[in-house]
């Protein structure tokens, strides 16, 4: 068993300074939770000095203050480039207090000055209407991770250090957070880190023993088991355990010196000798009481060191005078008169513990990654165009075409190493195999003879954990780089809530002038619902789009290009954009190609448009509008149009294709939305619209419910019918196929009369023929497999 480190070479005077800094941060943290006035306790505390609504989380806060104070010492001593990630981000008082003490907070918010008046404002704003949230939110300098939803701190930290060889991320992992699936998996991220070209993550597992009302698992297994667990993950654990402050200061100082020494030794060896074999990186296990230095007992019940200290220990001072008395005793226990001068400023000899300038963790430019953002070098997407010999000519698969474009983005940006591709073992499966012409999968575990495209250095990161891919990419973007997440459409749902949190982050940071814009989070969703016939029902779910459009209109964008040239145009736009979440849904299987590159670029720029060549309308309104959004819905719509034009030649048809889904919303609801007049010009004011949609049909109704002609919009899409079957049968099961679309049009056009009814009967016969054929032959009918668009239609 590893002994707790207690001896240290750090001077006793320095340890006393660290203790004073820690006490100052604790004082400011308690003040944020409780005080609305009397910030320096220049008079006895009165109930009028206490906030009427007490919010916040004390339990994790003193431990994080302890860590931050010690990191300040080691940053300054070793001139480290370091940022801080608060996994248990509900300890927001700690991050705010420390950035205030180091001065970075007041530089961004000058009205929160480093004096008594500023301190009062600091206290009042915390968890207060019109103030700041209780977590390590975007409003807090130095934060790249809010820590509200637990589990992503290590993933974000590793994303931050990829291609940042001089950066160290001190990542505090809460022992409650450590029970989440994403965090438990994230320990394996060390198998992807290259010590020669990447930075380092220093995890600090904070064992304070409790969650809201339960003990934590890692705090209740024995020392040896915990040590073996961390070693099994590939880490070298350094234990700091106890509750006596001065002994703990000594132990923590030595632990950090050992850890930083090991990191530097690992990196120096890799960079000087070329040895990139996987090292055992250090990590620290800090075991300290929950609610450390807070009230020992509250109302006769033990508080410090128990789950009772998780939030606000003394929660009712208005009704309980003893609580008010304890709050004052608690605040005065930090001896603020020793820490702050009469004006409320941290005494200089204590303030000198912290680094200065950009070395302060609250001012480090990596924590405001837009400051470091360098635009990608982009090839001309037009150079990858698919030549259109005729409308609907067969392509090789849209993502396979785009893979060559992305390959060259990798190549062009190799010098600056600021672009990466992330995916859960699906980069080849999703059609992006061309990228491996110029790069490898970065991998630092064992490599055996038959492995392909694995190397210690590469621009592709693949781990069969959507959580890690998403977290790595977010950390990479937040620190000023660019990336792409490719994923099966159905399984991107695994990161629904991670997307939610990132979209919230972008929303808030877009409202903070000091936060620079970062590159957009780009999803490429391939292997989609309509071509998962071979994997079955579990792999068929287009509902991520429903999740995405819930977020703020200023943040989210959704694109469904109908062919390869459109996909190239869309990807070029998305990879150049900043501060959005872009979701692109595209197919990987051979499919018809509709538009020349010039047409595709113009169509995608508009986001929606009439395909004149597909319809046959005259200058007046058509009899029916056939609309489509998505590659397979476009195919089925055009096949339906060809049937209608052949059998009902007098019927006038307009074909509308949608690439940018948000064009369907009113302009008042989304920046990309069409005005009512423009929408009516496309979809008419009173004609029936048969709309073939890639995802769940009610999403279109939701986006168009305010439109003049909404009552006449009839949407077909995925309605949760699926199995292992043929590609075309997937559309039949969901009434999205060409035969159903033809019948949908006829049902709403009584003027087609007997000819229409005979055509409807033919379509019903075709559906029976289809079912019989696939049941006998196991594949689609030749007229489906070999269908081609004809200009004569």
From Swiss-Prot:
Keywords: Lyase, Thiamine pyrophosphate. GO terms for biological process: carbohydrate metabolic process. This is Probable phosphoketolase. NCBIfam families: PRK05261.1-1, PRK05261.1-2, PRK05261.1-4, PRK05261.1-6. SUPFAM superfamilies: Thiamin diphosphate-binding fold (THDP-binding) (SSF52518). Pfam families: XFP (PF03894), XFP_C (PF09363), XFP_N (PF09364). PANTHER family: PHOSPHOKETOLASE-RELATED. Transmembrane segments: none annotated. One of its GO terms (molecular function) is aldehyde-lyase activity. Belongs to the XFP family. Its EC number is 4.1.2.-. It is an enzyme of class 4 (lyase). It comes from Rhodopirellula baltica (strain DSM 10527 / NCIMB 13988 / SH1). Its cofactor is thiamine diphosphate.
